[in-house]
Amino acid sequence: MTEITERIVPPPRKVAGVKESSAEKMARIPIKIIPMPAMRKPEWIRMKVPDSARFREIKQVLRENNLHTVCEEASCPNIGECFSGGTATFMILGDICTRRCPFCDVSHGKPLPPDANEPENLGRTIAQMRLKYVVITSVDRDDLRDGGAQHFVDCIAAVRAHSPQIKVEILVPDFRGRLDRAIHILKAAPPDVMNHNLETVPRLYKEARPGSDYQNSLDLLKEFGKLHPEVPTKSGLMLGLGETDEEILDVMRDLRAHNVTMLTLGQYLQPSPHHLPVKRFVTPQRFAEFERQALAMGFTHAACGPMVRSSYHADHQAQQAGVNF
């Protein structure tokens, strides 16, 4: 468990390119998290140790091309399986986020300007890896006038130029205060799957997603879908932050009301004692029931399980949702 209390935090003085991680990152959020003994992980929470030639090869290629993956930066539990299988979710716009979400292990700080060479590096690297499906995500960039939307477009275009047959899924931030501008910019190079995660239920937004707005996230998915009805829209949630089953079902209904067609539900795992605590471990049986309920609501695809993450087996998810490749 971890004790959580509210507090007033003075604004920090930031230096561009300097990362705040773990305890330092959490020291300035409005919610104070006091580390306490963690819940014991149940037997169904199992992670593969990342140790294979393919795993090491992918890490080397990423470093040589100055690229980042959310798999590494967010300490994803599936990194060993995905890297060993030759897949990765690329994180553009640097590895420093402008927000301090206390469930997330990505570093906070004042980011450096976008790397103008990143789109070309990304396109070349993905072609070198001979990928057929790729997921591109980013940190939040509240410092940019378009939230990073143009950089997404540049990266999508470069990837397709190097790999004409590839399918591209993007996992975007909420473009806070820039939603209309970002959606307009994305028209220049729409992805094959549009993903934006709600992360948790609206009651927990102040605690888990400070600076984000539940309705804004729903609007982002709906407005993009209106402009690109041929592109599946996708969202995901973490379970175990203190939500109820009925609240999860309510969010699923909201997603369907906003024409979202793909869903992922997975177990939240605390990255460190300084992050939000796990309040419960959802059983595989309950995840299976959520999946059944999602399909009954009209989702074309639902991936629900303890180790499911938004980009986990994203290529299989897209195929089952009707994306041809």
Curated annotation (Swiss-Prot):
SMART domains: Elp3. It comes from the Bacteria. [4Fe-4S] cluster 1 binds at residues 71, 76, 82, 311. InterPro entries: Aldolase_TIM (IPR013785), Elp3/MiaA/NifB-like_rSAM (IPR006638), LIAS_N (IPR031691), Lipoyl_synth (IPR003698), rSAM (IPR007197). Binds 2 [4Fe-4S] clusters per subunit. One cluster is coordinated with 3 cysteines and an exchangeable S-adenosyl-L-methionine. It catalyses: [[Fe-S] cluster scaffold protein carrying a second [4Fe-4S](2+) cluster] + N(6)-octanoyl-L-lysyl-[protein] + 2 oxidized [2Fe-2S]-[ferredoxin] + 2 S-adenosyl-L-methionine + 4 H(+) = [[Fe-S] cluster scaffold protein] + N(6)-[(R)-dihydrolipoyl]-L-lysyl-[protein] + 4 Fe(3+) + 2 hydrogen sulfide + 2 5'-deoxyadenosine + 2 L-methionine + 2 reduced [2Fe-2S]-[ferredoxin]. GO terms for molecular function: 4 iron, 4 sulfur cluster binding; lipoate synthase activity; metal ion binding. It is found in: Cytoplasm. Its cofactor is [4Fe-4S] cluster. One of its GO terms (cellular component) is cytoplasm. The keyword S-adenosyl-L-methionine applies. Pathway: Protein modification; protein lipoylation via endogenous pathway; protein N(6)-(lipoyl)lysine from octanoyl-[acyl-carrier-protein]: step 2/2. CDD domains: Radical_SAM. Residues 83-300 form the Radical SAM core domain. [4Fe-4S] cluster 2 binds at residues 97, 101, 104. Keywords: 4Fe-4S, Cytoplasm, Iron, Iron-sulfur, Metal-binding, S-adenosyl-L-methionine, Transferase. It is an enzyme of class 2 (transferase). Its EC number is 2.8.1.8. Coiled coil: none annotated. NCBIfam families: lipA, PRK05481.1, PRK12928.1. Belongs to the radical SAM superfamily. Lipoyl synthase family. This is Lipoyl synthase. It comes from Methylobacillus flagellatus (strain ATCC 51484 / DSM 6875 / VKM B-1610 / KT).
